[in-house]
Each structure stands twice: as structure tokens, then as C-alpha cells.
Regions:
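Intrinsically disordered, low-complexity terminal tails enriched in acidic/polar residues
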Residues: 1-56, 62-63, 67, 117, ...
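Membrane-interfacial loop- and helix-cap regions that link adjacent transmembrane helices
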Residues: 56-58, 112-155, 159, 164-186, ...
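The first (N-terminal) embedded transmembrane alpha-helix
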Residues: 59-78, 191, 254-261, 450-452
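Central hydrophobic cores of alpha-helical transmembrane segments in multi-pass inner-membrane proteins
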Residues: 75, 100-112, 191-199
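Hydrophobic, membrane-inserted alpha-helices
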Residues: 76, 190-195, 372-379
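Extracellular loop-to-transmembrane helix junctions
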Residues: 81-125, 129
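Hydrophobic alpha-helical transmembrane segments
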Residues: 83, 196-201, 378-384
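Membrane-interface helix caps and helix-loop-helix hairpins in membrane proteins
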Residues: 201-208, 385-389
Length: 484
């Protein structure tokens, strides 16, 4: 598939050259406009510009790969071993591969729609100075206000839950470094720290953070793999595999959640000089993620088997060592980065709602973002069910926001012969067959609707309700071991 896409991109290079040049100019203007906190502060601009090319400006394909790879997994590394215990090894690996490449497909679909949206807007001389394009705006420009409302609701709700999960995960991870404080206390502490994320303007400004993020997840993944292998199999370990339907589909929903990180595809593409490359960038990101998730989850399942069903945090099964503490610290650093990126689309929507998005003074926008972080803080304290809530978000929100809606939008928009003829991204399957493209769209929609929303939603909500009854909302220490 990748070879086909690359050859097809070369064929379209001449056709889309004007689009690329305009895009380059628009991105340059937009990027420069949002790199400083105050455009009127000329005294600081020179000092900032010395460092910005190295740590601040992230507009290349490699920067996009860093970001896509960095934000794709995060705390899921710690919950995937439990998903393998729910699914069994074969289903766990098989569903990862399936959902990974389904994610690549929907990312390609979003890329195609974004390219046509930019071409249409630029033909009307639309300026993107101090403006970041988002997914719901693409839907509105191509399909109208109803599609915009649908995309805005599901994508924003998904991002709210995803950002809250990062706070919940931070409290859970910090507990395994210092258990003198409860998970709720740690969540409150990190909620205050996460207020600093309001100071990052756009997806254009994540080069250093994305680089650090991928280092953190890589270290944690290989720590889990090596620690599990050196620990060896637990006494009387069993690998029963799926026992109950609700456990099986809950595990499948968590894997669906794992590969739902392309919910902010448009924001990343808008930060790139050549966004049409992102469809390949994301494929490479998914392949790298496979190298992190499959070895770590498989080795943990081999070592601890069915015992992983008792706790969704993989750290709880490994002895407390300096390496585990280092992995926990690495994950905490990554949670900060992940929270920042997950909350960014929410901040942008909020700024546009308040009419502040085009403000030349970034400090005004940063202050306006604070209520969003406080709201996310409240949600994370109310629903501290680490692991359980991941599956709920995966089945009900990831399914709709990043799989079903993009594929339906792709079929609807390109159903017209005229739009197909004028499409920048022509079909990549079966020698340019639109019918084959629509068949893949339909398969993704049906699969995710039935197994994700239907069965996965049922299993995840059942488990969430059980956890809420058992521990209650605003639980002090969810799934904490009893102290002797």
C-alpha cells in the first residue's frame, strides 16, 4: 500500500504544485505568527529566534512522525498487558495489527479531505494567518453545518476524555513511585502542574516535546519487556485467554483506543509545510508503535498471565527498583506532553468560541485556556478508573470520532462524480477504483460500529458501572493495594 501511495504522490506532484506553494506560504506566515507570546515584544524576538529552529519550530515530516509516534500510546503501554489477558495472545496481536492499519486508512481519508478543503479555500484567497484549521472546519467546508456539528461534538468530547485520562494515569503512575500519597492526591498535584501546558501555542511548537515523548515511551516499553522476561513466569501462572464476552470486547475496545491517536490529524497536518506527506508519516508511526506495544504486552502476559486481570497498571506487577522508578518518571514526563497535545484541540475550539483565536497577544489566549484545564482536572478526579475508562472512550468516542465519521464523510463527499474528478488524492486501490475505496470505508464503518460501539460499548459501560458502584465517584485510591 505504501509503494502505491508514494508513486501516486509523484504523479500528482505537478498537479498540486500550486497548492503546495500556497500552502508553504500560508504555513510560514501562520507559524511565524504563533511562535511568540506577544508580536509587539520586539526585544525578545531575536533571542527566541536563536533557539526556535532547534526546539520550537516543528513543521517537517520528521517532526510530524515524532508527534504521531509520541502521542499514540502513552499510558496504554501500561494497560495493554491486561487487554492481552482479556483477549488471549493471538487475538491481542491480531487486533493490534488490524486496528493499526484501519487507523492508517482513516488517516489517509482525513488527509484527502483536508487537501481538497485547503485547495477550495485557497482558491478564494482565504488567509490562515493566526488560524489553525481543525477537523470540524474541514467537515463544514466540504459537507455543511450538520457534519460540522457532528464532528465537533464527537472529536471535542473524545479529546476531553483523552486529556482527562492523562491526568488519571499520572496519579496512578506516581503512586508507584511514592505510595505515601493516594492516587487522588497525586492527580491533584499533577493537575496543577498541567496548567503549564496552556503556554504551548499550536501543534507547530512541539519539536522538543515530541522528541522527549518518544524517548520516554521507548524506554518504558523496553523496560516492561526486559523486566518481564528477567522476572520469569509467576508461580502457577495460567494463560486461560478469553473467559467472558464482556472481558473480551472490553479488551478489544482498549486496543481500538490505542490506535485512535489520529484524532488530531488535521492540527498536525496544518503545522506541516507539506501536509500531503502525513498519510505516509502515520504509517511509519504505526509500524514503530507496533515495535513498542507488541513485545511489551506479550512479555508481560507471558510472565503474569491471568493475574493481569486484577490490575490494569503493569507497574503493579513488577518489583520496585530504580529501573521501574525511572520508567514511571519517564511516563509522567510523557503524560505532561500527551496532555498538552490532547488538550490543544479543545483550547483552539474554546478560543474560537470566545473570539480570541486570532488575538496577536498570546498571553490572553493562554489565560483563557485555564478554565479548560480546571474542567479536565475535575473530570479526572471524578472518574479515576484507570484502564476501565480507556475502554469506554475507545468504544464510544474513538469509534465515532476517528473511524466512523471520517469514512462516512469520505464516501459522502466523493460520491459525486465532479468531486471525484477534481480530487487531489485519487484512489490508491485496484488501479484507481473509487468503488474499492468505498468498500474499504464501508468495512471500517460496519466493523467499528458492531464490534466497537455495539459490543465494546456494552462491555465497557458494564465494567465502568461496576467500578463506580464498588469504588464510588471521586475515589481516593482506585485499585490500590491494601496496606498491611
Amino acid at each position: 500500500m505504501m509503494d502505491g501511495v508514494m508513486s501516486h504522490g509523484l504523479e500528482l506532484e505537478i498537479v498540486s504544485s500550486s497548492f503546495a506553494r500556497n500552502e508553504h506560504r500560508a504555513q510560514t506566515v501562520s507559524g511565524n505568527a504563533e511562535q511568540t507570546l506577544d508580536r509587539t515584544d520586539h526585544g525578545d524576538r531575536n533571542r527566541i529566534s536563536l533557539l526556535s529552529p532547534l526546539i520550537w519550530e516543528g513543521d517537517s515530516a520528521f517532526d510530524a512522525w515524532l508527534t504521531a509516534s509520541s502521542v499514540q500510546v502513552a499510558p496504554v503501554l501500561l494497560t495493554l498487558p491486561s487487554s492481552f489477558a482479556q483477549l488471549g495472545l493471538a487475538s491481542g496481536i491480531g487486533l493490534q495489527v488490524l486496528y493499526g492499519f484501519m487507523g492508517c486508512w482513516t488517516c489517509y481519508v482525513i488527509t484527502a479531505l483536508y487537501a481538497d478543503y485547503r485547495r477550495i479555500k485557497e482558491s478564494h484567497n482565504t488567509s490562515y494567518q493566526n488560524h489553525t484549521i481543525q477537523w470540524h472546519e474541514v467537515l463544514q467546508g466540504l459537507l455543511g453545518p450538520r457534519w460540522m456539528a457532528l464532528g465537533l461534538f464527537f472529536n471535542t468530547t473524545y479529546m476531553i476524555c483523552l486529556a482527562a485520562i492523562q491526568m488519571i494515569a499520572s496519579g496512578s503512575i506516581a503512586f508507584y513511585i511514592n505510595d505515601h500519597y493516594s492516587k487522588r492526591t497525586w492527580t491533584m498535584i499533577f493537575g496543577a502542574i498541567f496548567l503549564l501546558t496552556t503556554l504551548i501555542p499550536t501543534a507547530h511548537n512541539y519539536r522538543l516535546w515530541s522528541f522527549l515523548g518518544i524517548l520516554m515511551t521507548t524506554y518504558t516499553s523496553w523496560y516492561l519487556t526486559i523486566a518481564a522476561v528477567t522476572h520469569g513466569q509467576a508461580l502457577n501462572v495460567k494463560h486461560t485467554g478469553p473467559k467472558k464476552l464482556d472481558e473480551y470486547f472490553m479488551g478489544a475496545a482498549n486496543i481500538l483506543y490505542t490506535f485512535g491517536g489520529h484524532g488530531f490529524t488535521v492540527e498536525i497536518m496544518h503545522a506541516m509545510w507539506k501536509p500531503k506527506k502525513y498519510k505516509l508519516v502515520y504509517v511509519y508511526a504505526v509500524l514503530y508503535i507496533f515495535s513498542l506495544t507488541i513485545p511489551s504486552a506479550s512479555s508481560m502476559y507471558w510472565a503474569f498471565g491471568d493475574g493481569l486481570l486484577n490490575n490494569f497498571n503493569a507497574f503493579s506487577f513488577l518489583p520496585k527498583t530504580k529501573f521501574r522508578s525511572a520508567a514511571a518518571v519517564a511516563m509522567l514526563m510523557h503524560e505532561f506532553i500527551q496532555f498538552s497535545f490532547c488538550s490543544l484541540p479543545i483550547h483552539l475550539v474554546w478560543e474560537k468560541l470566545l473570539g480570541l483565536h486570532h488575538s496577536r497577544h498570546f498571553y490572553i489566549r493562554a489565560i483563557a485556556r485555564i478554565p479548560i484545564v480546571l474542567f479536565l482536572w475535575l473530570i479526572s478526579l471524578m472518574f479515576p478508573f484507570f484502564g476501565t475508562i480507556n475502554s469506554v472512550v475507545g468504544s464510544l468516542l474513538v469509534s465515532a470520532a476517528v473511524y466512523i465519521i471520517p469514512c462516512l464523510a469520505h464516501m459522502t463527499y466523493y460520491w459525486s462524480f465532479m468531486t471525484r474528478e477534481n480530487a487531489i488524492e485519487q484512489p490508491i486501490l485496484c488501479r484507481g477504483s473509487w468503488r474499492a475505496m468505498f468498500l474499504v470505508d464501508a468495512f471500517v464503518v460496519l466493523w467499528v460500529t458492531i464490534l466497537g460501539v455495539g459490543l465494546g460499548g456494552w462491555a465497557s459501560m458494564k465494567n465502568l458501572i461496576q467500578q463506580a458502584h464498588k469504588f464510588g465517584l471521586f475515589s481516593t485510591c482506585f485499585n490500590c493495594p491494601k496496606k498491611p
